[in-house]
């Protein structure tokens, strides 16, 4: 019988907290499941409260554990999202390209982020359900224009067909890693990107 190893190698180098923000029904949970589990469900199930998934990726020789949080976008959950924003390093702002209202809500979500999240948090705008071309009402150029207005990146995705899902999450993680290197004294790093071999509390 072998005894448990006392000095096991670290499973990851850094832990990064990402958030999915947007109106209910835009496909936040579907994007999360596609990225974390490689699965897709066509049934709409409103997220109750808050849930998260984990996926560890490798970037430039470092293992980064992504803790990706998902919550419903309805107004009644806003009290939860105040705590939900705390410690976030990156946020994916999601709208549905077949739903004009969800696109119009993005400005409100950005104001919410500005109120509750860190000033340095990385953001990316996501137009989901790009596979539904016949029902599309929000043109790609409008999404790009809005993203440019706020100085953030933009991608259209399809959780159903796995279009740009990897690119969205990993692209945001790369931006966070770059910011971490460029601003090593950012106090947020000690909260949300914590080397696994230290005993710091994280998020």
Curated annotation (Swiss-Prot):
Belongs to the small GTPase superfamily. Rab family. This is Ras-related protein Rab-8B. Keywords: Cell membrane, GTP-binding, Lipoprotein, Membrane, Nucleotide-binding, Prenylation, Protein transport, Transport. GO terms for biological process: calcium-dependent cell-cell adhesion via plasma membrane cell adhesion molecules; exocytosis; hypotonic response; protein transport; regulation of aggregate size involved in sorocarp development; response to bacterium. It comes from the Eukaryota. InterPro entries: P-loop_NTPase, Small_GTP-bd, Small_GTPase, Small_GTPase_Rab. SMART domains: RAB, RAN, RAS, RHO. The keyword GTP-binding applies. GO terms for molecular function: GTP binding; GTPase activity. It holds the Pfam family Ras. A lipid is attached at residues 202-203 (S-geranylgeranyl cysteine). GO terms for cellular component: membrane; plasma membrane. The keyword Transferase does not apply. Protein transport. Probably involved in vesicular traffic. GTP binds at residues 22-29, 70-74, 128-131. It is found in: Cell membrane. PANTHER family: LD44762P. It comes from Dictyostelium discoideum (Social amoeba). The gene is rab8B. Its main location: membrane. It is a lipid-anchor.
């Amino acid at each position: 019988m072998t005894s448990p190893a006392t000095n096991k190698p670290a499973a990851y180098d850094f832990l990064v907290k990402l958030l999915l923000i947007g109106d209910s029904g835009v496909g936040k949970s579907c994007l999360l499941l596609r990225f974390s589990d490689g699965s897709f469900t066509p049934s709409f199930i409103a997220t109750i409260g808050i849930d998260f998934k984990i996926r560890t990726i490798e970037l430039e020789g470092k293992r980064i554990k992504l803790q990706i949080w998902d919550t419903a976008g309805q107004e009644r959950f806003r009290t939860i999202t105040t705590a939900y924003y705390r410690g976030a390093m990156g946020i994916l702002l999601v709208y549905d390209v077949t739903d004009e209202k969800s696109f119009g809500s993005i400005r409100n979500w950005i104001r919410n982020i500005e109120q509750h999240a860190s000033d340095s948090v990385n953001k990316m705008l996501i137009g989901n359900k790009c596979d539904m071309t016949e029902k599309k009402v929000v043109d790609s150029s409008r999404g790009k224009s809005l993203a440019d207005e706020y100085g953030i990146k933009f991608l259209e995705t399809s959780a159903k067909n796995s279009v740009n899902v990897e690119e969205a999450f990993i692209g945001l993680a790369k931006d966070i890693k770059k910011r971490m290197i460029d601003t090593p004294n950012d106090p947020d790093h000690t909260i949300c990107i914590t080397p696994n071999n230290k005993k710091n509390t994280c998020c």
